[in-house]
């Protein structure tokens, strides 16, 4: 955490000159601190406990003021473990909220909630910092145009398009390609939009965070040789951190993203994995602060806390923050207050299907379960809307016929249904796509497919012009021209074998 000295007139008051407070009570990660009269800190101010424990080891714990208790006492939540703290220790008010480094120097680095690098690559080469608590952009600053955020991924752009500056919920279990999809989006936004990404690991498993970092280095999203060429900044608050850190790490990531949007005027992609853990941490802190629990034991301030985070994720006239949030649904209950509050903010949902992953169709995005508020004729245009609806109808009919096919076989279907099934299978395979970040695993070069090319390809399949091509020609290709070229190659190979 960078300490920002507070300025009063021409005098700068440093930490050493401030009147310190004293710890008077410790309840797990929550501290009560007494300050001299007239020296009370503001809500959200950062406090620092700098002392030595009983065996002489230095202690440096940052806290955030959450409540004013009266009688010159405040209640604060610690951002790191409170082991070794005792009553009577000195507490210094920094006079400002937690501030974290921002700007290009953060790319390719891993930070904790306080903005301290944790990747053993030395200090961050920037003096620019920003407080993690800021108000959402004013109405007058917002960009109200509804525009599609093109990802270059066919299934997303056609069937559940993302809104520029929108919020997307990513639903997927373990091993269905969520990490690879996240990395491809980070790669594509850098190439197609000249943008950058910020990844906020909120209450993640440490192993998963480490795996993501290693995979990003392997795929070139993080450039080890020239760290400044990296396309992403990582902010982690893992499962083993105190609830204060898990509750605020999302804001740290968002603050870094806001700088790229407002100052660098870039399109930014913000990943939050997992938004449920943000709510969970808030619930733990709420109980420790003595607030009365609300529905299902969640904090009474659930909607406000979620709103204060989500309202900052938006498009302004300078740039945009498009957010992709992994959503854990407790006990698969969509009416649980945590996911239900999240759904109210989402513009699109991308659902990953284990069934498609088992078939080898990647990205394993479920074309029928994924939704988007952007898929309307007045926003995407009649041609896009009609093509998307016909693709969905074809796939839905294929899904309905699958039981009949399994029991009686394809031969029992009508001629019309057999043709529809053949086209649906081509569509299903054409929704797959080779990824840039998966080149090291698959050996096939990645493809970025523009929206116009995507629509043209699916129109050709639906029109029946490509009925004569084998379905394997559509598997893991970019645009439709590659599929026809692949079909010719397959035909030549089969002729040679004869």
Curated annotation (Swiss-Prot):
Per the record, what is one GO cellular component? proton-transporting ATP synthase complex
- Binding-site residues for ATP, renumbered to this chain: 172-179
Bilayer topology annotation: Peripheral membrane protein
State the UniProt keywords alphabetically: ATP synthesis, ATP-binding, CF(1), Chloroplast, Hydrogen ion transport, Ion transport, Membrane, Nucleotide-binding, Plastid, Thylakoid, Translocase, Transport
**PROSITE patterns the UniProt entry points to:** ATPASE_ALPHA_BETA
Subcellular localization is given as: Plastid, Chloroplast thylakoid membrane
SUPFAM superfamilies (UniProt xref): C-terminal domain of alpha and beta subunits of F1 ATP synthase, N-terminal domain of alpha and beta subunits of F1 ATP synthase, P-loop containing nucleoside triphosphate hydrolases
Q: Name one GO biological process term.
A: proton motive force-driven mitochondrial ATP synthesis
Name the InterPro entries for this protein: AAA+_ATPase, ATP-synt_VA_C, ATP_synth_F1_bsu, ATPase_a/bsu_AS, ATPase_alpha/beta_chains, ATPase_F1/V1/A1_a/bsu_N, ATPase_F1/V1/A1_a/bsu_N_sf, ATPase_F1/V1/A1_a/bsu_nucl-bd
The record's listing under Pfam families reads: ATP-synt_ab, ATP-synt_ab_N, ATP-synt_VA_C
| Catalytic activity, reaction form | ATP + H2O + 4 H(+)(in) = ADP + phosphate + 5 H(+)(out)
List the Gene Ontology MF annotations in alphabetical order: ATP binding; ATP hydrolysis activity; proton-transporting ATP synthase activity, rotational mechanism
Which Enzyme Commission number(s) are on file for it? 7.1.2.2
Assembly description: F-type ATPases have 2 components, CF(1) - the catalytic core - and CF(0) - the membrane proton channel. CF(1) has five subunits: alpha(3), beta(3), gamma(1), delta(1), epsilon(1). CF(0) has four main subunits: a(1), b(1), b'(1) and c(9-12).
UniProt lists the family membership as follows: Belongs to the ATPase alpha/beta chains family.
Q: Give a short account of what the protein does.
A: Produces ATP from ADP in the presence of a proton gradient across the membrane. The catalytic sites are hosted primarily by the beta subunits.
Q: What is this protein called?
A: ATP synthase subunit beta, chloroplastic
Organism expressing this protein natively: Nicotiana tomentosiformis (Tobacco)
């Amino acid at each position: 955490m960078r300490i920002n000295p507070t300025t009063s007139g021409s005098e700068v008051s440093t930490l050493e000159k401030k009147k310190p407070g004293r710890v008077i009570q410790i309840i797990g990660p929550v501290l009560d601190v007494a300050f001299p009269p007239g020296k009370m800190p503001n809500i959200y101010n950062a406090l620092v406990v700098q002392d030595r424990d009983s065996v002489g080891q230095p202690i440096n714990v940052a806290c955030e003021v959450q409540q004013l208790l009266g009688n010159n006492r405040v209640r604060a939540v610690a951002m790191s473990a409170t082991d070794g703290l005792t009553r009577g220790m000195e507490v210094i008010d920094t006079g400002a909220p937690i501030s974290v480094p921002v700007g290009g120097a953060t790319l390719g680095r891993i930070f904790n909630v306080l903005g301290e690098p944790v990747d053993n690559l030395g200090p961050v080469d920037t003096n620019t910092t920003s407080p993690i608590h800021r108000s959402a952009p004013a109405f007058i600053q917002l960009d109200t145009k509804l525009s599609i955020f093109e990802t270059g991924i066919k299934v997303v752009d056609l069937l559940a398009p993302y809104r520029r500056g929108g919020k997307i919920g990513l639903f997927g279990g373990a091993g269905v390609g969520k990490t690879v999809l996240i990395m491809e989006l980070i790669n594509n936004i850098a190439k197609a939009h000249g943008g950058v990404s910020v990844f906020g690991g909120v209450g993640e498993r440490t192993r998963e965070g480490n795996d993501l970092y290693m995979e990003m280095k392997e795929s070139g999203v993080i450039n080890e040789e020239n760290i400044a060429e990296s396309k992403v900044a990582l902010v982690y608050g893992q499962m083993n951190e105190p609830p204060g850190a898990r509750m605020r790490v999302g804001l740290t990531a968002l603050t870094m993203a806001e700088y790229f949007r407002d100052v660098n005027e870039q399109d930014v992609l913000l990943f939050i994995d997992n938004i449920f853990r943000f709510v969970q941490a808030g619930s733990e802190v709420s109980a420790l602060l003595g607030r009365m629990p609300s529905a299902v034991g969640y904090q009474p301030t659930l909607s406000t806390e979620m709103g204060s985070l989500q309202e900052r994720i938006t498009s302004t006239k300078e740039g945009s923050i498009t957010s992709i949030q992994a959503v854990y649904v407790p006990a698969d209950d969509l009416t649980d207050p945590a996911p239900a509050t999240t759904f109210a903010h989402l513009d699109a949902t991308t659902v990953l299907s284990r069934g498609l992953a088992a078939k080898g169709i990647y990205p394993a995005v479920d074309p029928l379960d994924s939704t988007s508020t952007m898929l309307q004729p007045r926003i995407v245009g009649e041609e896009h809307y009609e093509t998307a609806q016909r693709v969905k109808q074809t796939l839905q009919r294929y899904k309905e016929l699958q039981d009949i096919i399994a029991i009686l076989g394809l031969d029992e279907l009508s001629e019309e249904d057999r043709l529809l099934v053949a086209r649906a299978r081509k569509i299903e395979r054409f929704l797959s796509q080779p990824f840039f970040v998966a080149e090291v695993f698959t050996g096939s070069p990645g493809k970025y497919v523009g929206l116009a090319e995507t629509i043209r390809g699916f129109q050709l399949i639906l029109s029946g012009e490509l009925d004569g091509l084998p379905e394997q020609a559509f598997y893991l290709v970019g645009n439709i021209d590659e599929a026809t070229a692949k079909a010719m190659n397959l035909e030549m190979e089969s002729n040679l074998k004869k």
